[in-house]
C-alpha cells in the first residue's frame, strides 16, 4: 500500500496515499479496531451541514476569507451528495466525545480543499470557533431531527394512508371484537383498522412535539459551554445559515452548559420512536393472528403470499412482513435502553457517550423507516378481509348476549351464554329454551349492526 506522511501534535504517521484523511483519523483507525459499525452516514451528512454553516459564519465575522469559506462549503456539498463516503471509515467505538469523527471531517475537508488550491488547516480553519464538544452534539441533533422529518414521518404517513384506504374500503363489514384473547362485543372492521391507523399517527404527533427541543444546538458552547474562542453571536449566525440551507428550524440552545452535558432531548425523541415501534408491533401481531390458518387458525384476514414459508412443509406461507416488523420493534426498544443509559452519563461538563447515542438513534430511525415501507408495500396494501369467516364468527359468538342485558338483566344474560356454551347450541336457542324471549323478540334485540 502506498502511503504518505502526515503529522499532528503527536508526530508523524503514515496514511494511505489514496485517501484524504489525516493523522488523527489514521491514529483512530489504528487504535480503535473495534466492532466494525461505522459512524452513521447521517452523522457525516449532519457534520457537512454544520461545517458549511460554521465556515460561512466565520467568514461573516472575519475569521475566514471568502475563498476559504467557499472551499469548505464546496467540499461539504460533495460530502452530503455521498461523493466521499469512503473517506469516513471510523467506527462508533472511539472517544465518547466523537472528537476523532469531528477531526476526520475536518481533515478530509482540508485535504480536498488543498487539492483545489486552497490551503486549510483542519483545526485553525475548518474547526475555527468550534470544539468537538459542541460540534458532535450539534451534528447528533441535526441528524436526528432530519431523520425524523425526512425519513420517519413521511414513511409513517404513507403507512397511515394505506390503513385509511383499507378502512374506507369496508365501511359496513362487522366482525367480532376480542379482549383478553376472548370473544367480546362486535365492531366494524373499519373501526379496528382506524385504530391501527391512529397507532401510527399518534407517535407522529409525539415526534413532531419532540422536534423543537431536538432542534436546539450546542454550537457556540465550544469546550465546556462558556463559548471560549467563539465570536459573540456565533451560535445564532451558524443556526441562521443552517435554517437557510436545510429549511429546519435550528436555534442555539440558550444554556450551552445543558447542551453539552445533557442528551434529554434525544431521549425524549427516541421515546416517540419507541412508542411507534411498540404500536407497530401491536399492529403486526393483530394482523398475523387474524391471518392465521389457512384452515386451522382465525383466518379472518388474507395477506399477500410473498415467498415460500418452510423448507420442509410444502405450500406453507408465513406472515414474514409482520415478523420483520416485530423484530425491528424489539431492536428499537433495545436501542432506547442504550440511549437512556448513555444520556445519564453526562459527568460534569460533557456527556462522553455521544457516538453510541448517535448510532442507536440513527439505527432506530433507519429500521423504522425501512420496515414501515416494506410492511406497507408487501403486506398492508394487499390485505383483504374474509367477510364470510368474519360473519360466521360474529354469528357464532356468545358475546352478542351483551345487548340482552338491558332487556333481561345481567344474570339472566349470563345464564343464557353459559347454557349455549355448555350445550353447544346457538345463543338464540339457549335464550328461547330458558324462556326469556320469543324468537321474534330475540331477532329484534340481537342485531350486531346496532351494537357498533
Question: For each predicted feature, which ranges?
Answer:
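Conserved, well-structured ligand/cofactor-binding cores
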Residues: 1-452
Amino acid at each position: 500500500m502506498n502511503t504518505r506522511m502526515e503529522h499532528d501534535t503527536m508526530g508523524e504517521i503514515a496514511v494511505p496515499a489514496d485517501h484524504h484523511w489525516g493523522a488523527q483519523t489514521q491514529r483512530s483507525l489504528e487504535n480503535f479496531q473495534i466492532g466494525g459499525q461505522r459512524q452513521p452516514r447521517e452523522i457525516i451528512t449532519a457534520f457537512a451541514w454544520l461545517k458549511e454553516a460554521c465556515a460561512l459564519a466565520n467568514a461573516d465575522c472575519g475569521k475566514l476569507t471568502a475563498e476559504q469559506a467557499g472551499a469548505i462549503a464546496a467540499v461539504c456539498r460533495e460530502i452530503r451528495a455521498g461523493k466521499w463516503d469512503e473517506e469516513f471509515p471510523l467506527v462508533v467505538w472511539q472517544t465518547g466525545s466523537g472528537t476523532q469523527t469531528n477531526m476526520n471531517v475536518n481533515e478530509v475537508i482540508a485535504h480536498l480543499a488543498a487539492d483545489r488550491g486552497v490551503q486549510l488547516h483542519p483545526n485553525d480553519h475548518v474547526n475555527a470557533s468550534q470544539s468537538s464538544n459542541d460540534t458532535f452534539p450539534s451534528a447528533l441533533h441535526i441528524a436526528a431531527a432530519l431523520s425524523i422529518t425526512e425519513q420517519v414521518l413521511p414513511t409513517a404517513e404513507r403507512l397511515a394512508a394505506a390503513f385509511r384506504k383499507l378502512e374506507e374500503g369496508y365501511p359496513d363489514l362487522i366482525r367480532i371484537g376480542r379482549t383478553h384473547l376472548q370473544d367480546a362485543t362486535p365492531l366494524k372492521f373499519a373501526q379496528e383498522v382506524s385504530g391501527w391507523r391512529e397507532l401510527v399517527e399518534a407517535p407522529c404527533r409525539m415526534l413532531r412535539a419532540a422536534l423543537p427541543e431536538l432542534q436546539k444546538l450546542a454550537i457556540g458552547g465550544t469546550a465546556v459551554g462558556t463559548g471560549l474562542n467563539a465570536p459573540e453571536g456565533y451560535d445564532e449566525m451558524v443556526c441562521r445559515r443552517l435554517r437557510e440551507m436545510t429549511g429546519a428550524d435550528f436555534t442555539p440552545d440558550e444554556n450551552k452548559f445543558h447542551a453539552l452535558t445533557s442528551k434529554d432531548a434525544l431521549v425524549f425523541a427516541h421515546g416517540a420512536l419507541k412508542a411507534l415501534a411498540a404500536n407497530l408491533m401491536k399492529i403486526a401481531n393483530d394482523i398475523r393472528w387474524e391471518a392465521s390458518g389457512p384452515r386451522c387458525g382465525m383466518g379472518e384476514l388474507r395477506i399477500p403470499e410473498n415467498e415460500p414459508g418452510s423448507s420442509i412443509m410444502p405450500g406453507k406461507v408465513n406472515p414474514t412482513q409482520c415478523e420483520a416488523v416485530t423484530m425491528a420493534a424489539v431492536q428499537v426498544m433495545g436501542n432506547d435502553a442504550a440511549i437512556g443509559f448513555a444520556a445519564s452519563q453526562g459527568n460534569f461538563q460533557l456527556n462522553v457517550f455521544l457516538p453510541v447515542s448517535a448510532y442507536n438513534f440513527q439505527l432506530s430511525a433507519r429500521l423504522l423507516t425501512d420496515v414501515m415501507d416494506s410492511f406497507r408495500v408487501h403486506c398492508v396494501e394487499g390485505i383483504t378481509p374474509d367477510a364470510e369467516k368474519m360473519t360466521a364468527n360474529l354469528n357464532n359468538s356468545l358475546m352478542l348476549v351483551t345487548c340482552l342485558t338491558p332487556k333481561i338483566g345481567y344474570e339472566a344474560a349470563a345464564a343464557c351464554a353459559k347454557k349455549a356454551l355448555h350445550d353447544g347450541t346457538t345463543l338464540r336457542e339457549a335464550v328461547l329454551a330458558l324462556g326469556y324471549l320469543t324468537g321474534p323478540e330475540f331477532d329484534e334485540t340481537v342485531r350486531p349492526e346496532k351494537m357498533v
